[in-house]
Amino acid sequence: MNRKMKLKEFLTNEEYEGVIQNAIQYSDMSLPVWYLEITNKCLCELSNFDLIRCISQDVFKDLAAFEIIERIDEQNTPFYADIDSTEMMERLSSISPEILSAHKCKLDRMIENVERNNFIDFADVCMSDEEKEMYKGYVNIIKNKIK
């Protein structure tokens, strides 16, 4: 997948026109304006917040999941996003097994780093024991989805 393609290139002309009209009609609301703004960005330009929001809002969900997985793999740690790491893992765990399974090799590496290499104990992010357990729970959900 080309991470440099603008997100609007993944929309039909009609869908993109709808995004524009929504942003114009509801210009006082942040969500339609944000949606229009991200359509003019490529995946690699999206912030971690944008990726989390894409999954939460069910827009470009598969592309956002792909980008999160790519970033985790490139950085060789699921904690690259600092304070957003837990929320990103939570959102990633909500993705369908079909989408996650397409990235099985990279997710297996991530899971191994969390489970076997104890990356969670060496993360730059300070987590309480409860937060670590929650994080591991999200990892287990992903693990079960890609079996």
Regions inferred by a protein language model and the residue ranges of each:
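Long, low-complexity, highly charged intrinsically disordered regions
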Residues: 1-48
